Amino acid sequence: MPKSGKKPPGKREARKIDRREAIVEVAKRQFLDNGYAATSMSAIAAELGGSKATLWSYFPSKEDLFAAVLDDATSAYRQQFADLLRPSKDMPSAVLQFTRSFMAKLALPEPLRLHRLIVAESGRNPELGQLFFERAPGPTLALLKDFLADGMASGQLRQADPQLAADALT
């Protein structure tokens, strides 16, 4: 058994995980290429070479599938930011490092395409904008706000409203 205490997945479970990842990859490409409204579950199923029933068994709605795409697109950078926003003896340098990493991430092609998609679709589908905020900037803002509040409490950063400071940095 691995050190994490979790049993490794069996073949069937591993296939399910692989299939889910493949669905999310195809959906991401479809959403980015065609937009949310123009992407259908039928088109995703056709590209995968499977049935809509299989697709629905993994994701009960297009919104759930889009949420999985957002989670996939943001999980790696969210972990990177969480690692950067650990308590530090040099909080100002840590804030600077976070800001540089954040701006570098936003300038990459895929995040730019994702942001454009959200902006383009949010007018017709405001729930999509809310879903994006809850999955992407929201958790990052919460991490940064808590980090800044800790720095302010320890005296390493000037006292201010940590939420306003986090908003200003992002």
PLM features per residue range, with description:
Residues 1-34, 38-50, 57-64:
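Basic, helix-initiating cap at the start of DNA-binding domains
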Residues 16, 24, 70, 74, ...:
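Amphipathic, non-transmembrane alpha-helical scaffold segments
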Residues 23, 27, 31, 44, ...:
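Hydrophobic packing within well-folded, soluble alpha/beta domains
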Residues 67-98, 104-106, 110:
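Amphipathic alpha-helical linker/stalk segments
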Residues 93, 109-113, 117, 127-153, ...:
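Amphipathic alpha-helical packing segments from all-alpha helical-bundle domains
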Residues 100-107, 115-123:
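Helix-loop "lid/cap" segments that line or gate small-molecule binding pockets
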Residues 158, 162-166:
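Membrane-interface starts of transmembrane alpha-helices
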